[in-house]
């Protein structure tokens, strides 16, 4: 874990070391609709999760830690224990940013977040832009559940959340903004759209004034104008540098066997991104580095980076340094 490259925001004034982890524990839930697969029994002990968090923080001198997609950890029976453990190991000035999905709210999750004494930021990722598309992707009736969960976050969280929506068409942008604006209005929050990523200081300033920031991003903005082209290109080279906050490692998933799976940043089957399906085929950290440092991958990154098609900083942080 200590060899993971620190991630940097592309703007120097916001630059800091941090890492992003998602824990892909196993359970016996029927997850076809949400995860695209049935996964088996729990097999990652809480102590192992603590060890990974602690090693990561110490190894990278992290000022900011992202246990990404934390509400997906409803599949882990001790999600709240993990959040509380962050309280034990946090250092002065460290911020914890929880990236959650509105499909799930684990028991006690909101209460646990409200009890934390250090600074945290809850970013709620919404997949699907209207009732029809949501139910088509997630299963009939799921949209109603999501709306109910969002209302709970808005009413019960001590600090206002940030909402993060991907969109591809202008119609989806319009539906997204109307959808979240109406929900926020119900509980007395104003909405302000932002185009910078969730690390930007302006997010905090907006929240401090009692306004909900809504980060609506065009999903293809860092890669190419035509998302279909990305998928076609991925078919050829077996990876796609796909991210939404100026770095290649949006999240890494670690299982109990020590396998590390790219999540969000790189997909073996990127069609899963649009369907909100994670393809966790066996894929170790060594595999990831081999792909990143291959001539084919670096050439692709170099060509697209210099053409301004996406803004990952691999060229500046990777040992290959072919752009410099």
What are these model-predicted stretches?
Residues 26, 30, 244, 311-314:
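The −1 position to Zn-ligating cysteines in a subset of zinc-ribbon hairpins
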Residues 1-20, 235-239, 248, 297-308:
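N-terminal [4Fe-4S]-dependent radical SAM core
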Residues 1, 323-324:
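C-terminal end-of-chain micro-motif
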Residues 13-206, 211-216:
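Conserved glycine-rich "GG(E/T)P / GGGxP" loop and the immediately following alpha-helix
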Residues 254-255:
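Short, acidic, Ser/Thr-enriched surface-loop or helix-capping motifs
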Residues 41, 241-244:
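Solvent-exposed loop and edge beta-strand segments that line ligand/cofactor-binding
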Residues 149, 157-158, 188, 198-240, ...:
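C-terminal accessory region of radical SAM enzymes
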């Amino acid at each position: 874990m200590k060899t993971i490259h620190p991630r940097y925001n592309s703007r120097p004034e916001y630059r800091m070391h941090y890492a992003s982890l998602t824990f892909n524990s196993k359970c016996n839930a029927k997850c076809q609709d949400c995860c695209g697969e049935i996964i088996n029994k729990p097999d990652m002990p809480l102590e192992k999760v603590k060890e990974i968090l602690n090693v990561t923080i110490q190894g990278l001198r992290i000022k900011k830690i992202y246990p990404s997609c934390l509400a997906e950890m409803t599949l882990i029976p001790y999600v709240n224990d993990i959040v509380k453990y962050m309280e034990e190991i946090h250092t002065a000035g460290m911020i914890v940013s929880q990236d959650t999905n509105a499909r799930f709210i684990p028991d006690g999750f909101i209460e646990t977040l409200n009890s934390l004494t250090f600074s945290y930021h809850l970013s709620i990722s919404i997949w699907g832009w209207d009732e029809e598309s949501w139910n088509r992707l997630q299963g009939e009736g799921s949209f109603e559940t999501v709306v109910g969960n969002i209302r709970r976050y808005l009413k019960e969280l001590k600090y206002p959340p940030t909402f993060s929506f991907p969109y591809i068409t202008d119609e989806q942008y319009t539906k997204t903004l109307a959808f979240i604006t109406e929900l926020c209005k119900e509980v007395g929050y104003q909405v302000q759209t932002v185009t910078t990523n969730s690390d930007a200081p302006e997010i905090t300033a907006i929240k401090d004034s009692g306004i909900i920031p809504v980060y609506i991003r065009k999903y293809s903005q860092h890669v190419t104008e035509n998302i279909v082209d990305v998928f076609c290109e991925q078919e050829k080279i077996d990876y796609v540098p796909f991210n939404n906050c100026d770095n290649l490692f949006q999240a890494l998933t670690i299982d109990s066997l020590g396998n590390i799976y790219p999540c969000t940043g790189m997909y073996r089957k990127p069609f899963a991104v649009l369907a909100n399906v994670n393809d966790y085929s066996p894929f170790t950290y060594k595999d990831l580095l081999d792909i990143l440092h291959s001539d084919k991958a670096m050439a692709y990154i170099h060509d697209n980076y210099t053409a301004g098609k996406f803004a990952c900083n691999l060229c500046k942080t990777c040992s290959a340094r072919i752009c410099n």
